[in-house]
Design a protein with these regions (language model features):
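Active-site flanking residues adjacent to catalytic metal/cofactor-binding acidic residues
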Residues: 32
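Rhodanese-like catalytic fold shared by cysteine-dependent sulfurtransferases
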Residues: 1-19, 24-29, 37-83, 87-129
Length: 129
């Protein structure tokens, strides 16, 4: 059994570092921290970010995530600059691709390395209650 890779598609989202995340948030991008509640409490959260869990502890998708994004973005939700933040960046990449490819969002970003890269860059975090 043999197969040939004809093409490798680049993701429809952009991986960004901590510096670019700070810049985009200052320019009113929506930074959405999609980790679990216990993770927010453990590490804290990025100032200016919004918290909405994407998947529960059992891996079930949060069906209210789109409602949260629409509430934050308003009528032009697909054109907002949307940044996903996860623990290590992997879950954010999955959502980033889905929002860009399947839902038509045009300005999707993922914090490369997730909250851990933010911590490793010695960036400040706020306590989450």
């Amino acid at each position: 059994f043999e197969f040939v890779i004809l093409d490798v598609l680049n993701p429809n989202y952009e991986k960004i570092d901590s510096e670019k995340l700070e810049k985009l948030v200052k320019e009113n991008a929506v930074a959405l921290d999609i980790r679990l509640d216990n993770q927010w409490k453990k590490t804290g959260v990025i100032k200016g970010s919004f918290q909405e869990t994407a998947f529960d502890i059992n891996g079930k998708f949060n069906v209210y995530l789109m409602d949260k994004i629409r509430a934050l973005a308003g009528a032009e939700s697909q054109e907002i600059e949307l940044i996903f933040i996860s623990h290590d960046g992997k879950t954010a990449e999955i959502l980033g691709n889905a929002f860009a490819e399947d839902l038509g969002f045009t300005n999707v970003y993922v914090l490369d390395g997730g909250i851990q890269s933010w911590i490793d860059s010695n960036k400040p975090l706020e306590k989450y209650n």
